[in-house]
């Protein structure tokens, strides 16, 4: 039962990536990446969550959620500005490689700061790997 909110947050993220992936070959109308960006903002806000913790343990989930939102959200904003197949595909890749940051945010929110940082640190590695092997 404790894991349900985190699972729903990851499911919402996965939904945004899946919605974009349906248009990564043909491109999309600009409303799709705008809608998924709105969903991503909600996911980031939910993942950051309210915390009763103090100090860096309270700041860490917010910082990681900001990192997630910046990385994935920027790609969606670019796709909204120019919703061709390449930009939509790039947004899908950003969503896939941004998942470890989201998971790290959720871990940090529960108080597992070191685990959260370790998970989030996988995101840059994933981005490097995607340059060699397609994420999709």
Which residue stretches match the model-derived regions?
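Short amphipathic, positively biased membrane-proximal segments
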Residues: 1-136
């Amino acid at each position: 039962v404790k894991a349900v909110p985190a699972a729903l947050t990851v499911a919402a993220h996965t939904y945004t990536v899946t919605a974009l992936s349906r248009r990564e070959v043909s491109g999309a109308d600009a409303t799709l990446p705008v809608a998924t960006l709105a969903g991503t903002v909600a996911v980031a806000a939910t993942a950051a969550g309210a915390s009763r913790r103090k100090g860096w343990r309270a700041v860490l989930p917010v910082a990681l959620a900001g990192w997630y939102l910046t990385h994935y959200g920027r790609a969606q904003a670019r796709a909204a500005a120019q919703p061709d197949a390449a930009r939509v595909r790039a947004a899908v890749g950003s969503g896939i490689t941004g998942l470890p940051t989201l998971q790290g945010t959720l871990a940090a929110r529960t108080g597992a700061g070191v685990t959260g940082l370790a998970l989030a640190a996988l995101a840059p590695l994933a981005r490097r790997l995607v340059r060699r092997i397609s994420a999709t």
